Amino acid sequence: MWVLEEGLTSLSNVSRIGVLQPNDGDILEQIIDKGAKIIKDAPDSLPFIKKYADVRVVRRFLKGVISGEFEDFIILVFYNKEKALSGASLVSRGRPWYAPEGVTFLNEECSVAFQKGLGLSRAMAYVLEKRAGIDVKLLAFSNANTLNNKMLENTFEKHLGYSSYKTFYKEI
């Protein structure tokens, strides 16, 4: 694992954030096993995610991410102060179709937290802002868990200065 940030911040109880590397398959398997259970079993996960999420497809894709097959994605991992794996996030990097060359966005595609109240979103926002690089013009975060709406709104809008834009969806 390549360590991005180490040490507690005033924003959260995350003590280490890293990027999974090709030799981190054992950590990836823990994330997949715990994450699949959370996403599939949590009563407040969005219905279409519960319905269509396929662990085999997810495993194959995430293995491709850490092997470098999908260069526009990284997997961030989060550890608490006891050094226990506490969550993970799939982050994409790319240029939106409407932006000129040289404009890059970072987007949280999916996150799973194995420990409530850790401040994973705040820690991720902090480290991505700090390490984004000169070409990154926008950070975007998502939420697929309706239970966390108010908490994430509080985190991103009130504490971190983000704006929100609702996404509408309909299963057809």
Placement of each model-derived feature along the sequence:
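A short beta-loop-alpha structural element at the N-terminal edge
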Residues: L4-I38
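Conserved GNAT-fold acetyl-CoA-binding loop/helix
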Residues: K40-K63
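A conserved beta-turn-beta hairpin within the catalytic core of GNAT-like acetyltransferases
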Residues: R95-E108
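Conserved beta-strand-loop-alpha-helix junction that forms the acyl-donor binding cleft
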Residues: L139-E153
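A short helix-loop-beta-strand connector motif used in the catalytic cores of GNAT acetyltransferases and
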Residues: R60-V77
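Conserved acetyl-CoA-binding loop-helix of GNAT-fold acetyltransferases
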Residues: G117-K130
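Conserved beta-strand in the GNAT
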Residues: V77, A84-G94
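A short, internal acetyl-CoA/4′-phosphopantetheine-binding micro-motif in the GNAT/acyltransferase core
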Residues: L106-L120
